[in-house]
Amino acid sequence: MESQAPTLTPADIQRFERDGYLVVREAFPRADALAMQERWWSELAGTHGIRRDDRSTWRQIPGNLKAAKRDPAQAAILTGTVRGVFDDLLGAGSWSRPRDWGVTLVTFPEPGGWELPSRLWHWDNPCEPHLDRTRGLFVVSFIGPVAPRGGGTLILSGSPRLLIKQERRIPADQRRGLDGRTRERFYRSHPWLIALTGLAPSPADRIATFMDGETVVDGVPLRVVELTGEPGDMVFCHPVMVHCRAPNRGPRPRFMRIKQQFLTHEARTLLRGFLA
């Protein structure tokens, strides 16, 4: 049997290894994303009384959309392109079809200026299963259009490489997974990170300081990136990508999904051993 041609180029993989994320436009059909968006609006109306054509009903909802998370229509996300990305980044045969594509994120617009948050920066997975190579992904899917300042998740480009680098220096019997000490060590490892995460007074212009250019920390270039895209676009991130929720100052709600933990079979085995 002939081997499957790679979906990603060597430059794509190099970019992922450097920055910890890769944007893939039109990863699944726009029409399928828009069909899912219609179902989300139906659930918002039926469960929360929020109607698309009546902005007076728009408000933040508690939790996530429950029916949307289970919706069979999401099967359309696993296209040949998406399979190819998984194979190229994780290895063919190393992963299984996900049961779902993660949490359903809806953020309605609110008034005010757009500011870069200083709190709630975090990552969702421990470093341990990924110390020698990437064995999982943090996957973002765009169900609706998300423009700049429109509530798109903020990621810290380069952070997975820095976190893994720091974790490798710690003796195996002293690694603590996702506990508070691990997070605090990362946040306080450089003045730039201390200011980003609100542990020190912020610079006058947080956007310019943290988003307009890279700052090198321990040999790793870091920069805050706002995830924007069109329905059907996806972003494939390293599982220890540092990220943060962003305010929505745009004209429409943010509709995205995030699969926080998409792990290979090997990663699941390693994680069980680490947690035992």
Please state what every model-predicted region is.
Residues E2-R18, R25-H130:
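Non-heme Fe(II)-dependent double-stranded beta-helix
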Residues W40-H48, L90-S94, S141, A147, ...:
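A generic secondary-structure signal for well-formed alpha-helical elements
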Residues G46-R52, T81, K165-P171, G180-Y187, ...:
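Non-heme Fe(II)/2-oxoglutarate
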Residues L116-W121, L131, P148-G158, I164-R168, ...:
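A short secondary-structure junction signal
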Residues P126-P148, T228-P231, Q260-L263:
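Short, conserved beta-strand element in jelly-roll/cupin
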